[in-house]
């Protein structure tokens, strides 16, 4: 009996670029609940100016938004928008070096 690798019977994975776009959309929606939209627009423009409309730029934006949201939640989210009156400083949770 001839040995063969197992057949790929699992569900098809979606293409990488579609997954990146979906993750970015989810992060953007969550970030808009917590951060000033003007700040997010400025960040998006900065990334676009550096990388254009590329997966590399989307990846950098994903990393930045994940870190910002993590720090925000770690600092105690009160559903405020950082950068607006009543918003907290996300960097206050980092102990001084």
From Swiss-Prot:
Q: Which UniProt keywords apply?
A: Activator, AIDS, Cell cycle, Host nucleus, Host-virus interaction, Phosphoprotein, Transcription, Transcription regulation, Viral penetration into host nucleus, Virion, Virus entry into host cell
Q: Which residues carry this modification: Phosphoserine?
A: 80
The record's annotation in InterPro entries points to:
RetroV_VpR/X (IPR000012)
Disulfide partners: none
Matching entries from Pfam families are given as: VPR (PF00522)
Q: Does the keyword Nucleotide-binding apply?
A: no
Give the residue ranges for region: Disordered. Answer: 78-97
Q: What is this protein called?
A: Protein Vpr
Q: Which organism is this entry from?
A: Simian immunodeficiency virus (isolate Mm251)
Q: Which gene encodes it?
A: vpr
């Amino acid at each position: 009996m001839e040995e063969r690798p197992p057949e790929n019977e699992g569900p098809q994975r979606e293409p990488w670029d579609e997954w990146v776009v979906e993750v970015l959309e989810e992060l953007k929606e969550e970030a808009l609940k917590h951060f000033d939209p003007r700040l997010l627009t400025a960040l998006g423009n900065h990334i676009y100016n550096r990388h254009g409309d590329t997966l590399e730029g989307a990846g950098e934006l994903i990393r930045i938004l994940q870190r910002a949201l993590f720090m925000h939640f770690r600092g105690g989210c009160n559903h405020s928008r950082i950068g607006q009156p009543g918003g907290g400083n996300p960097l206050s949770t980092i102990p001084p070096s």
